[in-house]
Amino acid sequence: MGSIIQDVTLTPLRTISAPGGDVLHAMKRTDAGFTGFGEAYFSTILHHDIKDWRRHLRMTMNLVVPLGSIRFVLYDDRTDSTTHGAWMQICLSRDKNYQRLTVPFGIWMAFQGLAAPSSMLLNIADLPHEPDEAERRPLDFFKFDWKS
């Protein structure tokens, strides 16, 4: 369940300790995974909550967790992928695994808040939000044990 899905990348990020507060790198336009800029937004998730499955049709997401801890679960059902049918899960946090997760369009993803009271993610997307650009499914659409 921990293998990398084709075209999904993990990029270690730098934290710079500074008096009065640290600097957390997220992305530069010269970084791998940068495919353009559409919008950047923060999203919070409560401890133990899980956001439903979604798959973007054109958007590439670059996800960073600067606060708390989030488990991301990805499923590849792209028929032309070398990892068709593969699952991947990764927990990201500032303290234990500060990396950027790049998820291309066509990959199903859901995520769970692991830290109390809440966690925060930053999505640096190559497209602005469009309501019809993503497909959504309920959590029980794919058989995944969120308690494991």
Predicted regions located by residue number:
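Non-catalytic, conserved peripheral segments adjacent to functional cores
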Residues: 1-97, 114-148
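Short beta-strand His + acidic residue motifs that chelate non-heme Fe in jelly-roll/DSBH
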Residues: 101, 109-114
